[in-house]
Curated annotation (Swiss-Prot):
GO terms for biological process: cell division; chromosome segregation; DNA replication. It comes from Streptococcus sanguinis (strain SK36). Component of a cohesin-like complex composed of ScpA, ScpB and the Smc homodimer, in which ScpA and ScpB bind to the head domain of Smc. The presence of the three proteins is required for the association of the complex with DNA. The lineage of its organism: Bacteria, Bacillati, Bacillota, Bacilli, Lactobacillales. GO terms for cellular component: cytoplasm. Keywords: Cell cycle, Cell division, Chromosome partition, Cytoplasm. Participates in chromosomal partition during cell division. May act via the formation of a condensin-like complex containing Smc and ScpB that pull DNA away from mid-cell into both cell halves. This is Segregation and condensation protein A.
Length: 236
């Protein structure tokens, strides 16, 4: 399965999505939390051996610099540089937001004008059918990053060293179906309760994403940053 960041037009688009979840002015967001979520998302993709393009890694480096400076003792010069870096980042996100809104407005105007022409509007079909059609799927990845961290700690304390490679997504899809069956909803972390190694954890998550993609499983998050639940088809 090929999972990429193509639903986001770049790292600023990803950051804008994270910032917008706070529902406050961009300059009022807790920037450290946003940075941690961005880094957790990218780290999760890397742990799953998925493609992360260079521009996302460049932004990750910049965010790590801002985060590291915020952890340093407050010195006048350092504090000023830290504020400059943070304000520059927020300004970039705000500028990107304005351009994106303008682009969406122009797109709507184009669609309105198309109604006045007899010639049928050309429909563009993109061949890249990506998994992340809904950007809220990023919340799944953010929740999964916590699962990975917990499981890595759990496995590191275990004396079991056998790692299997033969897990199949199709088999794990059936596991998720069975665990969702008969329940009104299932907390995401419950799916991974009995996993034995990291390969199983990752394959199980990919299976969950595939079930979401084919609409066999619905994702529910009742509030921003809240727990994520899975609802099987027929249990809505």
């Amino acid at each position: 399965m090929d999972i990429k960041l193509k639903d986001f037009e770049g790292p600023l688009d990803l950051l804008l999505h994270l910032v917008s979840k706070y529902q406050v002015d961009i300059y009022d967001v807790p920037i450290t939390e946003v940075i941690e979520q961005y880094l957790a998302y990218v780290a999760t993709l890397q742990a799953m051996k998925l493609e992360v393009t260079g521009e996302y890694m460049v932004m990750a480096s910049q965010l790590m610099l801002i985060k590291s400076r915020k952890l340093l003792p407050k010195v006048a010069d350092n504090a000023e540089l830290e504020d400059d870096l943070e304000q520059d980042l927020l300004s970039q996100i705000e500028e990107y937001r304005r351009f994106k809104l303008l682009g969406e407005k122009m797109s709507l105007q184009h669609d309105d004008r198309a109604l006045y022409y007899s010639k049928p509007k050309l429909e563009l079909v993109y061949e890249d059918a990506e998994l992340l059609h809904d950007k809220s799927t990023i919340d799944l990845f953010l929740a999964f990053s916590k699962v990975i961290a917990k499981k890595q700690e759990e496995f590191s304390k275990s004396h079991t060293t056998i790692v299997r490679d033969e897990y199949k997504i199709e088999d794990m899809m059936e596991v998720v179906r069975q665990r969702c069956a008969g329940k009104s909803r299932l907390a995401l972390q419950e799916i991974f309760a009995e996993t034995k190694d990291m390969n199983e954890v990752i394959t199980l998550f990919l299976a969950t994403l595939e079930l979401v993609k084919v609409q066999e499983v619905q994702v529910i998050q009742e509030e921003n940053f809240g727990n994520i639940y899975l609802v099987g088809r027929g249990n809505e």
